[in-house]
Amino acid sequence: MKNYTGPIFIIIAATLWAFDGLIRQHLYTLPPITIIFFEHLFGLIILFPFIYKYLLGTRLTKREWWLVILISILSGLFGTLWFTTALGKVHFISISVVFLLQKLQPIFAITSARIFLKEKMDGRYVKWAVLALGAAFFVTFKNGYVNFATGEGTIIAALYALGAAFAWGTSTTFSKMLLGKVDAKVSTFYRFLVTVIITIPILFLFGYGASLSTPTISQFGFLALIAVSTGMLALLIYYKGLAKTSVHVSTILELTFPFIAIILDMVINNTVLSLSQWIASFALVYSIYKIVKLREEVALL
């Protein structure tokens, strides 16, 4: 059984992440920036008692602080903002599609790593990246047909989802630069802290200050649930599983995440993908798997 504990932990983490979109649906009356503020604030409060000793022993350099700020802006602010906004446009795009488009993150991660870290890029990468992007189009638009009655709304919703994939994928590169110097728990805490600090002036500058007092008790409960379950808890379970699982196996297991989200969307929201979207989904996930494998092969050279 010990041989299976790692993969089981990764699948549990993937399942928790899949629930994230469904939980956020209950917060549709709140501005996305307000959701970001509270989920990071709650995460910060919950995380602090467990890592304050690590914080006392850590001193960040000027370069490391800039990396934390950059990661917070990309991942904490824009990534979460665009993802939450995309989920709010359920009249144009299903939750399943939003989650599937997140699998494009490795394309942005590898491209940014090539630019900023000068990592090698295999020539075969372009072929699989083009396939992934083509599949993403058919995932977004059923049968490849753009309904011009709702086409603009669908495109905007898809662009928000792609924007989230870009922000999170690119921040992976900067996180890699930071994690080489700073403990993961400490960098996560500072990312949450900086995100909270950044969102405060944005809330008031754009007239959302009053929304801080509008969440209901149940919405506060959902915000806390996001911070604990699909946020930190999922991440801790994932890292525990990753420590006991080879990279090759974990890469495959992580690809179960969008399909778990699709199943949950079908069961809870009665959303069913068309045959063309299912085919495109498998093509998208397989091409991303090949891209990740190519990156592993290049890293070993």
What are these regions, as identified by a protein language model?
Residues 1-34, 73, 149-177, 264:
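Glycine-/small-residue-enriched transmembrane alpha-helix faces in small-molecule transporters
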Residues 4-8, 34-50, 66, 70, ...:
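Hydrophobic alpha-helical transmembrane segments of multi-pass integral membrane proteins
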Residues 18-30, 42, 81-93, 101, ...:
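Juxtamembrane C-cap of transmembrane helices in multi-pass membrane transport proteins
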